[in-house]
């Protein structure tokens, strides 16, 4: 268990209020340098800012371990390359972030639980936020280089994802609980290969999808429970010019034995789908009558893209 957090925390935690961002980062770096292994978060409540992954690291949350993420936006600077509703940009760091990593995981019976006070205010999407979105739409539609799309400034209030893995390979998300999220809950963006299983997701804020796979391929999602404020499982493929530039469909996705307790849609496609979606198979999943739709494909005349080979079986 290279890079285990127990000893690091014993040296640095005081009164349960120490922000452990640096301690976690050091443990992940040590684990990566040693060739990989598990970074263990022990039982207890640990306050932290963003967690940035390196290859060959499993962040393991022991039972009754709670990672509590701060809600101070400055903790999530400097900005990192991410995406917002299908458009690439530099924004506040996601709470758990990986870029160009391989063989990474979050496992264990612990809980990810961000503090939500600031993000709840940002849910309201005031005029400066809407103006910032228009600015980002314009930059994306005119092919402004991504590094110039700096959105973590002023009152833009573009909320960070809870989990955002970007261009990663061999991903495992297993067993842990999620309790609330600033924006999309789990966003797997241009990732290749992975398993998402045994998750318990409860998040009822604005835009809180259960899981979003965007321009990703070769994933299995199984035995998860989704109780969220938007759609449960969402398959996306980028928006307009960015997606046409990246030219990467979302494909080869299996979803099985998952339950949705509350939310809008069991399986959604789009509306970011300009790169195309194909080969999605959902079976043996359940949703209550209160869910608006079992399946919903969303697009508009500007998106382009395609939807091919969608199967749903034994869904009720």
Language model segments and positions:
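Short glycine/acidic-rich loop motifs that flank beta-strands on beta-rich extracellular proteins
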Residues: 36, 47-50, 70-72, 92-93, ...
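Single conserved hydrophobic/aromatic residue that forms the stacking wall/gate
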Residues: 1-9
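Beta-rich accessory regions
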Residues: 24-30, 34, 283, 301-316
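Right-handed parallel beta-helix
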Residues: 63-64, 102-111, 169-179, 192-203, ...
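Parallel beta-helix/beta-solenoid
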Residues: 97-121, 130-144, 166-178
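Surface-exposed acidic, glycine/proline-enriched linker/cap segments
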Residues: 1, 76-96, 125-158
